[in-house]
Swiss-Prot record:
Source domain of life: Bacteria
Record-stated family: Belongs to the class-II aminoacyl-tRNA synthetase family.
Source organism (scientific name): Buchnera aphidicola subsp. Schizaphis graminum (strain Sg)
Protein name according to UniProt: Asparagine--tRNA ligase
Keyword Nucleotide-binding: yes
InterPro entries reported in the protein's UniProt record: Aa-tRNA-synt_II (IPR004364), aa-tRNA-synth_II (IPR006195), aa-tRNA-synth_II/BPL/LPL (IPR045864), Asn-tRNA-ligase (IPR004522), Asp/Asn-tRNA-synth_IIb (IPR002312), NA-bd_OB-fold (IPR012340), NA-bd_OB_tRNA (IPR004365)
Length: 466
């Protein structure tokens, strides 16, 4: 007899009154004095549980079944029947019931029947996936991941596995994790006292990647449309609900594509994801509606129906200055927008997703294309309500002379970027791309405000447990 998942039962894939076998964990047990027990079992394949009816005719009824507690792992063989109760559509009349794993001490089991706060669940991250909420988040995360791959494949994009270890600083910042095999108690030094990285594993200073963009551009210049999707690392000392040291990033690069075209593409991609979730994950979405965000369905439907607002950075600054609102962070031209500025624009002023374009070059990375005014770059940040920046991208600088100038202005050695510069020397093309924080997208969709509740094992400042 084949193993059946609970999701298959609720998809009406299984014929009623046929024998089936399921595996799962106990969510609850009710037992009557007349010799019947009603055990709720889940297996994580969907939000639903299934009720199992076990009676005293089972050989291990008194020995095992009457001692079941939440969390016990079980396998049940029985007959799938239509439930006579109104709380569930199906139930299983058990003919064989086996306990695979007991909860050693139910009184100290961290995931008990009571409701737990998200803060508490972070402390038991290895067990929190056993709760309904985290299960919902994981299934939604999985569906978004699969939907992105499906969408990009339909659009003719190829997935490229970019390296996690790099010798380049893509963003030009110092917030990188260093990779080394050197003995920290006896670090080799040069005569001048600096670290001799030639003695290290890679023979040079190396880091965990902050972005796969530069490598991705190399393949965009031959395959036209490419993307990468994987973990990214930032040693940013920010202990907030919006920051992780390790997170997942989707990065897109498209040759023969300008800023306007990549903007349209990003909007189409996000709307495809939301539409797919409302179609295929509606039960999980409804759970979030009941427990996290009462407006989630209307919010996602509105997201599908509105056009994204597009404004210049200068106009965004003018709106903020004219709002007369007192911000914690000063607003002026040439200052990077803070989260409070971004959220004011999308939540108070426009009440819709906003794309800000054409930032001052001083605020952006060396690889962004310099505009004709020589003061701004063809950059874009896509902002959404509740989150702020979701996507950051630009048209890339394809002119080697301008690229070299920007590297020099930012104090970066062009020799370190020799292969990246080669892309401009040999058959250069105009191209554009963007990066999207995967956890931020999930946060926006689910309404879960703390990003640490969205990734299975969060890595943050002073925290690398589990």
């Amino acid at each position: 007899m084949s193993r059946i998942s609970i999701s298959e039962i609720y998809k009406d894939d299984i014929i009623v009154n046929t024998p089936i076998t399921i595996f799962g964990w106990v969510r609850s047990r009710r037992s009557s004095k007349s010799g019947f027990s009603f055990i709720t079992v889940y297996d994580g394949s969907c939000l639903n549980s299934v009720q199992v009816v076990a009676d005293k005719t089972l050989s291990n009824y008194y020995k095992d079944i009457l001692h079941l507690t939440i969390g016990c792992s079980v396998t049940i063989t029985g007959i799938l029947i239509l439930s006579i109760g109104d709380k569930q559509k199906y139930e299983i009349k058990a003919t064989k019931f086996q306990v695979l794993g007991w909860i050693k001490n139910p009184d100290t089991y961290p995931i008990s029947a009571k409701k737990h706060s998200l803060e508490y669940l972070r402390e038991v991250a290895h067990l929190r996936s056993r709760t309904n909420l985290i299960g919902v988040i994981v299934r939604i995360r999985h569906h978004i991941f699969q939907s992105l791959h499906k969408f990009l494949n339909k659009q003719g994009y190829y997935w490229i596995p970019t390296p996690i270890i790099t010798g380049l600083n893509t963003e030009g910042t110092g917030e990188m994790f260093r990779v080394s095999t050197m003995d920290m108690r006896n670090i080799p030094k040069k005569i001048n006292g600096s670290v001799d990285f030639k003695k290290d594993f890679f023979g040079k200073e190396s880091f965990l990647t902050v972005s796969g963009q530069l490598n991705l551009e190399a393949y965009a210049c031959s395959l036209s449309k490419v993307y990468t999707f994987g973990p990214t690392f930032r040693a940013e000392n920010s202990n907030t609900s919006r920051h992780l040291a390790e997170f997942w990033m989707l990065e897109i690069e498209s040759s023969f594509c300008n800023l306007d075209e990549i903007l349209i593409f990003s909007e189409d991609m996000l709307k495809y994801i939301c539409k797919s979730l409302l179609k295929y994950c509606i039960n999980d979405i409804k759970f979030l509606k009941n427990y996290i965000d009462n407006d989630i369905i209307n919010r996602l439907k509105k997201f599908l129906s509105v056009n994204f607002i597009r404004i210049n950075y200068k106009d965004a600054i003018d709106i903020l200055l004219n709002s007369k609102k007192k911000f914690d962070n000063v607003v002026s031209f040439g200052v990077d927008l803070n989260a409070e500025h971004e959220r004011f624009l999308v939540e108070k002023h426009f009440k819709a997703p906003v794309v800000i374009i054409n930032y001052p070059k001083e605020l952006k990375a060396f690889y962004m294309r310099l505009n004709d005014d020589k003061k701004t770059v063809a950059a874009m940040d896509l902002l959404v309500p509740g989150i702020g920046e979701l996507i950051g991208g630009s048209q890339r600088e394809e002119r080697i002379s301008v690229l070299d100038l920007r590297l020099s202005e930012l104090g970066l050695r062009k020799e370190d970027y020799w292969w990246y510069r080669d892309l401009r020397r040999y058959g250069t093309v105009h191209h554009s791309g963007f990066g999207m924080g995967f956890e931020r997208l999930i946060s926006y969709i689910t309404g879960i405000s703390n990003i640490r509740d969205i990734i299975p094992f969060p890595r943050t400042v002073k925290n690398a447990d589990f």
